[in-house]
Swiss-Prot record:
Species annotation: Mus musculus (Mouse)
Protein name per the record: Selection and upkeep of intraepithelial T-cells protein 3
Record-annotated membrane-spanning stretches: 238-258, 284-304, 325-345, 360-380, 415-435
Name of the gene encoding the protein in the UniProt record: Skint3
Domain Ig-like V-type: 26-141
SUPFAM superfamilies: Immunoglobulin
């Protein structure tokens, strides 16, 4: 009988304990925001949690923490704020609003929100051995109006556009659009984070030559849906350099033909016919034309061959290299033409058989032959180099290889300067030697020829 009473008493104790646990588990729950809270960078974040049913929480422990329970963001216990147990970076940036603590409601306020404040926040109410918690998700957002488009100098293939924006969080969405709002695939995209963990975005677009359109760079924060944009108008004026190059090459081609024909005219004045030495003119013309065609063919091969993909970081450097090579080859064309003709005239200085009536015309032609190359060479070189330096002043390439390329380019410019002054120097020597060979002024020669003709008629 005694053992039965003991068992019954133990059963009652267990039943009471279970009943107390059931009752205690129904003491309260915690409610709060179920959706993520957006916190602007540098602003104020407020997170609230509420006991349900409402009850006084002044003698409870209220703990806010992030990832670890033992590292609280804020700790309140028995009516006191325990700042000594909180994380150091939150000590001076947080406060607990306890205006409604009698109803079981508290609010954590965080000042000067940073990117590191992004994440989950746990709100814990503890009463004795019983506790409940609620988790609130915080999303830190940062937008920026600092957006700009950098247009690199137009080149033979098109124009490279760069859209830059900094100070975003989280990583924003970025795209190019045309005037109709249609998305244009970007050539490349890149992002980086600064010391404050904010995203700096860069997006490139390579636009074809000659397109007249409005291109817009859009960037959007996917959390706040805030959007920034900037537009640029691509017109034909951006590619005026192309017309300049066509004009330069056309001038070279147009002047080259009459320049070469001066040999034909010279022989005609000397001998009255070009049949005796026409093969010299043909050889000279063939040498000039073949060399020019070879140089122009090399330029076309370099430009038409896909050397570096557009998405490659060295694409712009390669394009600039092609432009500089084109400048150098244009200089070589002019120099080659000039050198061939100077050599030919140097070897063809025998004017035996020249009739007296053509001496004045011959001297005039000789002056033209000497002066024309000088003017032509000087004009072509100046046009080429002026346009070249106009392009170079606009170039800004952050590529580390650009410095090595610049040193190589300086050497090429020195070579170009040599090619400019060498024919000019030869021209001056030719002109001085020609002046020495002229015994009298040309008009005196013409008077003497008239006197000779008058004597013969008598």
């Amino acid at each position: 009988m005694g053992s039965i009473q003991i068992i019954f008493a133990a059963y009652c104790v267990v039943l009471c304990v279970l009943q107390m646990l059931v009752l205690s588990s129904e003491q309260f729950t915690i409610t709060g925001l179920e959706r993520p809270v957006l916190a602007p960078l540098g602003g104020i974040l407020e997170l609230s949690c509420q006991l349900s049913p409402p009850q006084n929480a002044q003698q409870m422990e209220i703990r806010w923490f992030r990832n670890r329970y033992t590292e609280p963001v804020y700790l309140y216990r028995n009516g006191k704020d325990l700042h000594g147990e909180t994380i150091s970076k939150y000590v001076e940036r947080t406060e607990l609003l306890k205006h409604d603590i009698g109803k079981g409601k508290v609010t954590l306020r965080v000042f000067k929100v940073t990117v590191d404040d992004d994440g989950s926040y746990h709100c814990v109410f503890k009463d004795g051995i019983f506790y409940e918690e609620h988790i609130t998700e915080v999303k830190v957002t940062a937008t920026s109006s600092d957006i700009k488009i950098i247009m690199h100098p137009p080149n033979i293939k098109g124009v490279m556009l760069e859209c830059h924006s900094r100070g975003w969080f989280p990583q924003p969405h970025m795209e190019w659009r045309d005037s109709n709002g249609q998305v244009i695939p970007a050539t490349s995209k890149s992002q980086s984070q600064d010391e404050n963990k904010l995203f700096n975005m860069t997006m490139n677009l390579f636009a074809d030559v000659g397109l007249h359109q409005i291109v817009t760079c859009y960037i959007q924060n996917l959390l706040t849906h805030q959007e920034e944009s900037i537009s640029i108008v691509l017109t034909g004026d951006l590619f005026s350099w192309k017309i300049d190059w066509i004009l330069i090459l056309s001038i070279i081609a147009c002047v080259m033909i009459p320049y070469s024909m001066t040999s034909y005219l010279q022989q005609h004045l000397i001998h009255g016919s070009c049949s005796q030495r026409s093969h010299h003119w043909r050889k000279n013309a063939m040498v000039c034309m073949s060399s020019v065609i070879a140089i122009i063919g090399s330029m076309l091969i370099l430009h038409l061959k896909q050397r570096v993909p557009i998405s490659d970081q060295h694409f712009e450097l390669d394009t600039l290299y092609l432009e500089d090579i084109s400048v150098i080859l244009c200089v070589v064309i002019v120099f080659n033409l000039k050198l061939n003709l100077l050599t030919y005239y140097r070897l063809e200085r025998k004017y035996d058989g020249c009739t007296p009536g053509c001496k004045a015309c011959f001297y005039i032609l000789k002056i033209i032959i000497i002066i024309l190359p000088f003017v032509f060479t000087f004009g072509c070189y100046n046009a080429i180099f002026l346009k070249y330096h106009q392009l170079q002043k606009k170039v800004s390439i952050p590529d580390p290889l650009y410095y090595f390329y610049t040193s190589w380019l300086v050497n090429m410019e020195m070579l170009g300067v040599f090619l400019v002054f060498f024919p000019t120097f030869i021209n001056l020597i030719e002109f001085s030697q020609f002046i020495k060979t002229v015994p009298k002024p040309i008009w005196l020669c013409q008077e003497n020829m008239r006197e000779d003709d008058a004597i013969r008629h008598r």
